[in-house]
Amino acid sequence: YAPQIRRKIEEHILRSKPYARMFQYTEMIANAVEASRKWPLRELDSIEITQQELDQIALVDGMQEQQLLFTMLCLAKYRHAVNANSDGWISTPRVDVYKMANVSGTLEHKAAVQRHIHDAGKIEWPRRADSENVKVLICDLDGEPALHIRDFRNLGYQYRRWCGEAYFACSECGLVVRRNSNRMKYCKDCADEINRQKARERWFQLA
């Protein structure tokens, strides 16, 4: 069982970071394998987002608010896929949720973005003031999927891409980033690594 988990984690890392140096992830992989002993392996092809959910998100004023709500929805749908009794609750640390949603700015600004979503009636907070849990109130578990989410990196940018803005998926690692020119094919990290490889190849040709 442990070798299977390790292989799946390594495959996931290499899909999202084709040029990863695996020795840098040794400790992280070992910790993940150890933690996985408590839960069975569960593979998901994608998280399905319905048109009704997207319509609910579009009702919220502000693009950053929509990005954050979309990200929270994706996390809630994932949680439901692995635990049908989750009832829309997510427990991901807020700092991680903001990062996944590509919501930038001060902590006060980020808190204000979440408060706007709460005041719009799309999320619910727990009674405990010190809890980071959030309940997403717009989950549609029966509708036909309009969008399939297979990558939880840059979910905010994925939402903006769905909205028709100038974002694209890197041809090498699949990361969704902003398109600054029509010629862009790669994210910055992959472009830098490809350029380094080309430079090494040219050096060997000249040697």
Roles of regions detected by a PLM:
Residues 127-129, 162, 202:
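Short helical patches
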